[in-house]
A protein has these predicted regions:
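C-terminal catalytic histidine-bearing segment of alpha/beta-hydrolase fold enzymes
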Residues: 1-22
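Buried hydrophobic positions in well-ordered alpha/beta secondary-structure cores of metabolic enzymes
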Residues: 14, 104, 187-188, 228
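N-terminal glycine-rich anion-binding loops that anchor highly charged ligand groups
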Residues: 56-70
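Charged, compositionally biased N-terminal leader segments and the immediate start
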Residues: 23-59
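Conserved mixed alpha/beta catalytic, RNA-binding, or beta-rich assembly cores of soluble enzyme
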Residues: 105-176, 184, 190-192, 200
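A short, well-structured juxtamembrane/interface segment
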Residues: 79-94
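C-terminal functional extensions of proteins
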Residues: 194-238
Length: 238
């Protein structure tokens, strides 16, 4: 009979790098690469401007598109974008006036650069609110959609950024159709295979002429949504 003598190791928690003294010098340079942050940004945005076809977009929309391309590395993205003619001006005016930002994902809320926001705008994501799971269960929907119902009256005039759940975008449009508060602008870039493309079409065709930004099809996600919000929050491209 074989008797195992293995026991679970006892890991000692250490702060990262605590076993090594702080480095006084960087490691020896072995590769040829650009390390200056400002130069990386400058070259990146110049490359995007050179390679992407932005000709179909207005000048203010181009700034937003460049930021979104920078977040994804996909220079063909503008072909899939649709900007309402008033999206950029309306969203920026709302943010300057102190409008809150509502989003469907905590990753988006965390990614929004607070120092870019022009009026210390509040950023809300209620996905993890204690009321959300119960609402989702009773209504037979996703937690992302249920959380939208908790946005309440503050939604009036707000900027909405939906980057994960098509159900959240559909639910928002249904709330508005029932006479609920209307945001000033909607960034609708939910990602996915089920309902994503359809929810964006519904937003573009909204009967209230609400300003929108979408990336048609299945493409979307937190990185794209965050890039759009950060670009709208600050007019400078870099």
């Amino acid at each position: 009979m074989i008797i195992s003598t293995w026991s679970r190791p006892r890991w000692t928690r250490r702060w990262p790098g605590s076993e090594y003294p702080p480095m006084s010098e960087p490691p020896r340079r072995r590769y040829d690469y650009v390390s200056d942050a400002a130069e990386i940004y400058r070259r990146s945005f110049a490359t995007i401007r050179a390679e992407a076809d932005l000709s179909a977009l207005a000048a203010d929309a181009q700034v937003v598109a460049v930021r979104m391309i920078h977040a994804t590395g996909q220079v063909g993205l503008p072909a899939e974008m649709a900007f309402h003619p008033r999206l950029v001006t309306t969203a920026r005016d709302a943010l300057r006036a102190g409008a809150p930002i509502f989003t469907d994902a905590q990753m988006i809320a965390s990614g929004i650069t607070r120092r870019r926001l022009p009026a210390e705008n509040a950023v809300h994501c209620l996905l993890h609110d204690e009321r959300t799971p119960g609402l989702a269960y009773r209504w037979g929907t996703t937690r992302s959609a249920a959380a939208v119902s908790l946005w309440g009256s503050e939604l009036e005039g707000a900027v909405v950024a939906i980057g994960n759940a098509p159900t959240a975008l559909f639910h928002l449009l249904e709330l508005i159709a029932d006479g609920g508060p209307r945001p000033s602008a909607i960034i609708g870039i939910p990602v996915g295979f089920i309902g994503s493309a359809e929810s964006k079409v519904a937003l573009v065709e909204n009967p209230w002429d609400l300003p929108y930004l979408v990336v048609h099809g299945r493409r979307g996600g937190s990185a794209l949504c965050v890039a759009a919000v950060n670009a709208l929050a600050q007019e400078a491209e870099i």
